[in-house]
Structures are given as C-alpha cells and as structure tokens.
A protein has these predicted regions:
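Beta-strand/loop edge motif enriched in small/polar residues
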Residues: 57-413
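Secretory-pathway extracellular proteins and peptide precursors enriched for disulfide-bonded cysteines
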Residues: 47-48, 226
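C-terminal motif of bacterial Sec signal peptides marking the signal peptidase cleavage site
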Residues: 52-55
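Bacterial Sec-dependent N-terminal signal peptides
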Residues: 2-47
Length: 416
C-alpha cells in the first residue's frame, strides 16, 4: 500500500545553510558540517512525515519526491472488513479483521481498506511452516494492547513486515515487543518505507506525541546490571508489562532488521523513569541491522539503548520531547550518520544525547562510538528540562567524532 503525503519541506539547500519547514513551521539551520550535508529532502511516506533517507558516501541525503496521495490496493479483492459481500480477507493472516476500524480508515482514504487487529502474543501457532508471521502491505495493521512476538526464549518466531506496510496504535497501551530469540524483519525501501504511527495520523485527525506506545526489541546482549560471571540474566525493560525481559552474554546476538522504518507520535509514561520510547533496544546485539530509521515526535526518548552492542546508521530523530539518543546499562554499539532536530516550534525538547552507565559494580562502563552526528536545538527551557546538546553522566565513556551541536543562543551545549 503506497500512501505518500509530503509534510516536510527542505529549501535553500547548501552545505552551510538549509531551511527546514515542518508542518508549516520553519527553522533555519545556520551550520551543517560537510559530513552531514543535506542535499535533498526526504520523500515523505504513507500517511505522514515518513522521512526516507538516501545515504551515500557518508552523507545523509534528503530527497524530494513526487506527491502521491493515492492508495494502491494490492489485494485484488474487496477489502472492507465486515461490510458485506466478499471481503477478500485472507483467513490465514494474523489478527482479526475489525469492521469498525476498516470503516474508519476506509472513510479517511476514500476507498475500501482492510484493518486487521493484532493483540496478545504471536507465536508459532500464528506462523507459517518456516516460523514466519507476515504483515502484508495490502492491509493496515492495528496494535491492541501489548503485542508480543514470541515468548521469552521460547515459541520463537520472525515477524516479517513488507515494504510500505502501515501499522498503528490508538493509545499509549498499544505497543510492539519483540522477545528474546524472536526476530523482526522490517525492511522497507527508500520509496516505500514501513510506517508505525498513531490512529489519528492514519485517519487525518490532530497528531501529537504520545498517541500510542512504541516499539521494544529485546535481546541477549550484555548489561552492567546483569551478573558479571555470565550467569542467567533477565532484566525487566522500561515501559512494558512484566515479562518483557532482556540481557545475557551474547553481544553478537541478532534480533533481525529495521531498515527504512519510521516511528511517529509514540511514547507513553507509565510512571516517572518508566516510559516507552519511540524504539527501545534492550540488550540487542550487533547481529541486528538498524539503518535508515526515523523517530518523529515521541513523548519520551527517540531511541534508547539498554546495554547490548547493536549498531545503527542513518538515524533521523526529530521533534522528540525527551532525549533523542539515550544509552545506559553498558551500551557498547556504534552510531553513525545521526541527525537530531528539536521541534521547530520551540516546544518540548531535552538532550540530543543523554548517556549513562546506570548501575553495576562500577567496573563496567557504557562505551559507545559515535561518528558524523549533528544536533540542532531550540529555545525550549523550563525548570525541569531544556534543549541541550549532550550530557554524559555516571559510568559512561564515549568516542565522538565529527560531532556538531548548533542552534539558537539559548541551547545548552555539552555537559560531562
């Protein structure tokens, strides 16, 4: 399903100056290092600001494409849920068709669209003979409550998401969890990314941070909070219900792939210091591929790494209300080509990076490596939070190369 709606425009592009206009709000970026040269504009995708990165030779390239507001129905049948007649539904597909949601989304798009609801735990009983559960792009998928992929180190399956697929949640309690030993294979393309967003975004209502939960990926990587003797470890991850655990001894573990994926309008605070991020990586290993990913307008952190050693490239983190990049628990991965921009309207923002070691015996530190990163702040400043570039706290080190912090005079720069 290809639904393209452009909502972010870049004009006046050069290596030193670029004007970004988001939702009719503009911010002028006065400085851009050559490594972060913005040449073109992302082609926005499926239902809203799906910023599609086309990186080449170390640049983050943002390319402007044609606007296509059409819906391509690849089903070949009449997809409308329980609207009478032949629905064209695949009875072997995961989840249940919702006639209500199908009707709401169909009305918004002006043509028949099938919405299937995913809930509970998806295991081998829901998979094909190869242990794969596939979300196709001829259906829109809704999350209802926590949706777990596999059990922890049991009933392991792979969730395969086709390019151009749209997934949404309706409340902060709707989120996706990939359990240890299960995988997510979410591989979009530059012209047809995978979109995970809110119901409001899908139907064209008012959008904002915190309209659904987010994505949680759990792996078998190391953590400073795990026993350092290599014995069993199962740490409860922030934001998710009990049983969503991570940790182990394998920093090369693979949880699958996220490529050309956009997560928007997510984040949810269960309690202080217990929140869902746009994407949470708990003990995720370096065998996982993360490339060309955007998190936009999240109510908490854009991405957070709890231990592990997963690497990520071509990250775009825009208008997130807390830290854009957060790490702790001994995270040791590599991040390259990272672009952070706080909200253009100077609304809620915090740090471009917040790094911690967070616990353990004091001997193990977080030690990530970052190269080619730009942070553009805004003027947000309150007693509790303000727009800052970098904060490194207890038990963390970091190697930073080609790192730029810029923005208005009010922005906090760096604190170590």
């Amino acid at each position: 399903m290809k639904l393209l709606l452009q909502r972010l425009n870049v004009t006046n592009v050069s290596s030193t100056s670029v004007k970004v206009s988001a939702f009719s709000k503009s911010i002028t970026i006065p400085y851009l290092e050559k490594h972060m040269e913005l040449k073109q504009l992302f082609k926005a995708s499926a239902i809203a600001t799906a910023l599609v990165l086309a990186g080449c030779g170390g640049d983050i390239n943002i390319s402007e494409g044609d606007i296509d507001n059409s819906v391509t129905n690849n089903n070949g049948g009449n997809t409308g849920g329980d609207t009478g007649g032949d629905t064209g539904s695949d009875d072997t597909a995961p989840g249940e068709v919702s006639s209500f949601l199908s009707g709401e989304v169909s009305d918004a798009f002006g043509q028949s669209v099938e919405v299937r609801v995913l809930s509970g735990r998806l295991t081998a009983d829901d998979a094909d003979d190869q242990g794969v559960i596939t979300l196709t792009n001829d259906t829109v998928w809704a999350l209802e409550g926590p949706v777990f992929i596999g059990n922890d180190k049991a009933d392991s399956v792979t969730l395969a998401i086709e390019e151009g697929t749209v997934i949404f949640g309706r409340t902060g309690a709707d989120y996706l969890v990939v359990s240890r030993d299960s995988k997510i294979e979410a591989e979009g393309t530059a012209s047809s990314p995978i979109i995970m967003t809110s119901f409001n975004d899908v139907v064209g209502d008012e959008v904002g941070a915190g309209q659904w939960g987010g994505v949680v990926i759990l792996g078998n990587g190391t953590s400073t909070k795990c026993p350092q003797d290599g014995s069993d470890c199962a740490l409860q991850v922030e934001g998710a219900e009990e049983g969503a655990v991570f940790g182990g001894t394998d920093d090369t573990d693979s949880s699958g792939i996220l490529k050309y994926v956009v997560v928007k309008y997510a984040g949810f605070e269960i309690a202080p210091d217990n929140e869902l991020n746009g994407i949470t990586f708990g003990g995720v290993g370096s065998g996982t591929e993360v490339d060309y990913v955007q998190v936009h307008s999240n109510a908490d952190d854009g991405v957070e790494f709890f231990g592990g050693a997963v690497n990520a490239k071509h990250l775009v983190l825009t208008a997130n209300q807390d830290d854009s990049v957060d790490w702790d628990n001994g995270y040791k991965g590599k991040l390259q080509y990272v672009y952070v921009q706080h909200a253009a309207d100077n609304s809620d923002a915090n740090r471009g990076i917040e790094g911690d070691g967070d616990g353990g015996d004091g001997l193990e530190f977080s030690k990530p490596m970052l190269a080619n990163m730009t942070v553009i702040g805004n003027t947000f400043d309150t007693a509790d939070a303000d727009s800052e570039g970098l904060l490194l706290r207890d038990q963390t080190g970091a190697n930073l190369m080609n790192f730029l912090i810029t923005g208005p005079e009010e922005i906090g720069r760096a604190h170590v």
